[in-house]
């Protein structure tokens, strides 16, 4: 009986020494015994430096940094392309209507059509809105009364390098798809067309004239 008890004590002491030796080996190698094979101890200390949810919900590292906005400079006049015997120079496609949404939509259609047909589009812009008052003469008397106010919207699609042989086909396409109520006109680009893009400021011009 004493011999069997001695063997059990020896085995128990042997396992304790092995566990202590493995713990000492983990400590000297810098390895955490809790998460290693054969670990026998549990620790209540936090193994992370911050909160468990630290970093969750961050998205700024996924978004590209925004580029600084460039200041809009003054629009300068470009050199006008005169054209050759085989192709037109700079042409302006004017679209005029009373409905702004219809004018804008058809201007986009013409722009996309030019891109599809490999026609170079220099730029697409809006002209200043024009208003016209309609006056009505009374049945009795010479006094004029305001009947309505008509607002005219204009969009311009500027193209260049249109082939002379293809020009007739191109104009026929945009004219056949012209919506009702939209006026179409195509003419060569001039310096007056460039100046007409901007609203006149007579007061500012007078002040500049006085300063100069």
From Swiss-Prot:
Record carries keyword Mitochondrion: yes
Residue list for modification N6-succinyllysine: 199
Known partners and oligomeric status: Component of the mitochondrial ribosome large subunit (39S) which comprises a 16S rRNA and about 50 distinct proteins. Interacts with OXA1L.
Keyword DNA repair: no
A GO CC term assigned to this protein in UniProt: mitochondrial large ribosomal subunit
First and last residues of the transit peptide: 1-28
Pfam families reported in the protein's UniProt record: Ribosomal_S10
Lineage: Eukaryota, Metazoa, Chordata, Craniata, Vertebrata
Family note: Belongs to the mitochondrion-specific ribosomal protein mL48 family.
Chief location of this protein within or outside the cell: mitochondrion
Species, as recorded: Bos taurus
Origin superkingdom: Eukaryota
Coiled coil: none
Protein name (database record): Large ribosomal subunit protein mL48
């Amino acid at each position: 009986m004493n011999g069997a008890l001695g063997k059990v004590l020896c085995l128990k002491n042997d396992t304790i020494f092995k566990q202590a030796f493995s713990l000492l080996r983990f400590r000297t190698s810098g390895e955490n015994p809790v998460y290693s094979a054969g670990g026998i101890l549990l620790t209540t200390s936090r193994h992370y430096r911050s909160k468990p949810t630290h970093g969750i919900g961050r998205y700024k590292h996924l978004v590209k940094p925004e580029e600084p906005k460039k200041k809009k400079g003054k629009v300068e006049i470009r050199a006008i392309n005169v054209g050759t015997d085989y192709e037109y120079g700079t042409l302006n496609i004017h679209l005029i209507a009373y409905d702004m949404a219809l004018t804008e939509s058809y201007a986009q259609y013409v722009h996309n059509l030019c891109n599809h047909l490999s026609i170079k589009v220099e730029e697409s812009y809006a002209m200043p809105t024009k208003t016209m008052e309609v006056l009505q003469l009374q049945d009795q008397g010479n006094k004029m009364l305001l009947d309505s106010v008509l607002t005219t919207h204009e969009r311009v699609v500027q193209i260049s390098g249109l082939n002379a042989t293809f020009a007739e086909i191109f104009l026929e396409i945009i004219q056949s798809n012209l919506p009702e109520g939209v006026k179409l006109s195509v003419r060569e680009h001039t310096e007056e067309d460039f100046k007409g893009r901007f609203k006149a400021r007579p007061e500012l011009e007078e002040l500049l004239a006085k300063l100069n």
